[in-house]
Curated annotation (Swiss-Prot):
Keyword set, alphabetical order: Electron transport, Heme, Iron, Membrane, Metal-binding, Mitochondrion, Mitochondrion inner membrane, Respiratory chain, Transmembrane, Transmembrane helix, Transport, Ubiquinone
InterPro entries: Cyt_b/b6_C (IPR005798), Cyt_b/b6_C_sf (IPR036150), Cyt_b/b6_N (IPR005797), Cytb/b6-like_sf (IPR027387), Cytochrome_b (IPR030689), Cytochrome_b_C_euk/bac (IPR048260), Cytochrome_b_N_euk/bac (IPR048259), Di-haem_cyt_TM (IPR016174)
Protein name, as recorded: Cytochrome b
Organism expressing this protein natively: Polypterus ornatipinnis
Annotated positions binding a ubiquinone: H201
Listed GO CC annotations: mitochondrial inner membrane; respiratory chain complex III
PROSITE patterns per UniProt: CYTB_CTER, CYTB_NTER
Sample GO molecular function, one term: ubiquinol-cytochrome-c reductase activity
Note: Heme 1 (or BL or b562) is low-potential and absorbs at about 562 nm, and heme 2 (or BH or b566) is high-potential and absorbs at about 566 nm.
Compartments, as annotated in UniProt: Mitochondrion inner membrane
């Protein structure tokens, strides 16, 4: 008798992707991040759907509707806390996923890597428009400041900003369209994730030693399904603890005040997961230069495969590259800290130094470390 998972047209696809998929036997817990991102995306879509049932995208009612969800809707407070903190965990998993890709040389699967960068941009866009929806002070002013950056684009900038706003300032049309974008983009992310997985399955997964693993592979199920399940349990424990014990730990207190166009907050800042990019944006005094630096701080990831000079793939056997990556990790943490500080000395100069170092690592230190390691390997 034929096994249905191997013969049914739909089951066959699932079987080849999640059950009989040959996977390297030595992939570590760093390879759990992809499945955790899938879990985060599903959780965000489900909680977001329930929130959308009660949310009102009108500037007079948006703030009150969020309060209504938390006070009057059955378990509304829990759904809202899950959704808000789920975004933070989503980005933690994304950054760890990217870090793993950089560390183990997974970026050499260029199509998968570039699709991942597009996914990162889509996710950042979704999170940004979502942050505007509660219509608190930080939502309103964050939307005003970030959308205003587009006015730096020569010739079409001002027209583009007014087109996005739907008027001459951030107002009712802006909120309505941001809600529409926030609803549709996660489905675009889900579709792009499938493309990401298709590209990955063309080449097969990388592994910690960065060599061909064809000779030593095991089926994805049961080995990695159970390994992923452990990751799921840990992630769910973290989000439950966050949502129940400290739901506002990662929120900005400014967003507990309804949006007021007449009062500018003393310090406008985005959510913590955008602070590193925000610090790079602020470190350049020129508006257009800042916008380009902000964009390039993400798009520079697409250059990583092109700037790979080493004969070895994984950082496991690359001491200089390892040091470079840990400097990058420290630099991103410094930028995150600077992004949350006011624009005054000594933060300005620290931010500028950290921003220069960020680009220097990608454009100079990474290729240089590979070149030096090749020299070391070629010694008699």
């Amino acid at each position: 008798m034929a096994i249905i998972r191997k013969t049914h047209p739909l089951a066959k696809i699932i079987n080849s992707a999640f059950i009989d998929l040959p996977a390297p036997s030595n992939i570590s817990s760093w390879w759990n991040m992809g499945s955790l991102l899938g879990l985060c995306l599903i959780a965000q879509i489900i909680t977001g759907l329930f929130l959308a049932m009660h949310y009102v995208s009108d500037i007079n009612s948006a703030f009150s509707s969020v309060a209504h969800i938390c006070r009057d809707v059955n378990y509304g407070w829990l759904i809202r806390n899950f959704h808000a903190n789920g975004a933070s965990l989503f980005f933690i998993c994304i950054y760890l996923h990217i870090a793993r890709g950089l560390y183990y040389g997974s970026y050499l699967y260029t199509e998968t890597w570039n699709m991942g960068v597009i996914l990162l941009l889509l996710t950042m866009m979704t999170a940004f428009v979502g942050y505007v929806l509660p219509w608190g002070q930080m939502s309103f002013w964050g939307a005003t400041v970030i959308t205003n950056l587009l006015s730096a684009i020569p010739y079409i900038g001002d027209t583009l900003v007014q087109w996005i706003w739907g008027g001459f300032s951030v107002d009712k049309p802006t909120l309505t369209r941001f809600f529409a974008f926030h609803f549709i983009l996660p489905f675009a992310i889900a579709a792009a994730s499938l493309v990401h997985i298709v590209f990955l399955h063309e080449t097969g997964s990388n592994n910690p030693v960065g060599i061909n693993s064809d000779a030593d592979q095991i089926p994805f199920h049961p080995y990695f399904t159970f390994k992923d399940l452990l990751g799921f349990i840990i992630l769910l424990l973290i989000i439950i603890m966050l949502a129940l014990l400290s739901p506002n730990l990662l929120n900005d207190p400014g967003n507990f005040t309804p949006a007021n166009p007449l009062i500018t907050p003393p310090h406008i800042k985005p959510e913590w997961y955008f602070l590193f990019a925000y610090a790079i944006l602020r470190s350049i005094p020129n508006k257009l230069g800042g916008v380009l630096a902000l964009l390039f701080s993400i798009l520079i990831l697409m250059l990583v495969p092109l700037l790979h000079t080493s004969k070895i793939r994984s950082a496991t056997f690359r001491p200089l590259f390892k040091i470079t990556l840990w400097i990058l990790a420290a630099d991103v943490l410094i930028l995150t800290w600077i992004g949350g500080q006011p624009v005054e000395d000594p933060y300005i100069i620290i931010g500028q130094a950290a921003s220069i170092l960020y680009f220097l690592i990608f454009l100079v230190l990474m290729p240089l470390s590979g070149w030096l390691e090749n020299k070391m390997l070629n010694r008699d």
